[in-house]
Amino acid sequence: MKTIIISDFDETITRVDTICTIAKLPYLLNPRLKPEWGHFTKTYMDVYHKYKYNGTRSLPLLSSGVPTIISQSNFNKLFADELKYQNHNRVVELNSVNEITKQQIFKSISLDQMKTFARDQNHDDCLLRDGFKTFCSSVVKNFESDFYVLSINWSKEFIHEVIGDRRLKNRHIFCNDLKKVSDKCSQSYNGEFDCRLLTGSDKVKILVKILGEILDKIDSGCNKEGNSCSYWYIGDSETDLLSILHPSTNGVLLINPQENPSKFIKITEKIIGIPKDKISSFEADNGPAWLQFCEKEGGKGAYLVKSWDSLKDLIMQVTKM
């Protein structure tokens, strides 16, 4: 069976949030650059508190009133409050990147400088989570057509270089990309952001768009294997939850509870609402490497998974590869 992977980038493919890494580049190139990055951190928090969400965020997402099976017909109704909450967060994120644009922090940095920086930061694949490359070689049979990145990161060039597989198509990377300008010799950033991908509600819209484009290829006869495809969305954070729960894919929350226990408990227990007995079982040292926590139509599901190696085993079991 053909496996289509659509994955978040930061802290899913990588060990850390690399937006913080990218933020170092302008100051490495120009140590006298002002304002310092702390200005933007403060701006973000000021806007966050100013535009604090006053609506209803119904938590946990999977309350006792949620039907057993998530479907195309009930998804928008079930998660209407979460969609509104995530969409509201666009105000905060947009104000943040607009301030970075206003101060021209990334203006005139060349794409080649970003690529070199990414390779330097990822020496010996130090930014990649263990097992990611093995997963890709074992599970993704045609990386060129079957692997997508869906991220709120700022640079396609950075993402491409860190993943390090030349078969990854630029048009398969979706992110809050820095805009480019070209001259006769090279391309550089103009300091502005694309701003189409800022929040979890943006992510789920683009997820649906990606899946629609894949199905269009199937309908047009470009993809002969389409009817036997298995679709997977993989993420690690709150901005991934709507995509993880969407009925079109098998969804994966890729978190190791031993490595980040506070994040794990917040997302699984407080936000999603996974029963404590399931969480306790998964947390244990000798606990399962993966655990299904909800069902979707068509036999799909949403899963807790500890590592890329565990995800490889899960997909092989589900698809009987």
Predicted regions and their residues:
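A short, charged/proline- and glycine-enriched loop
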Residues: M1-T3, N227-S228
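Alpha-helical substrate-recognition element adjacent to the catalytic core
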Residues: K2-D177
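C-terminal cap/substrate-recognition subdomain and adjoining C-terminal extension
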Residues: H123-Y148, N153-M321
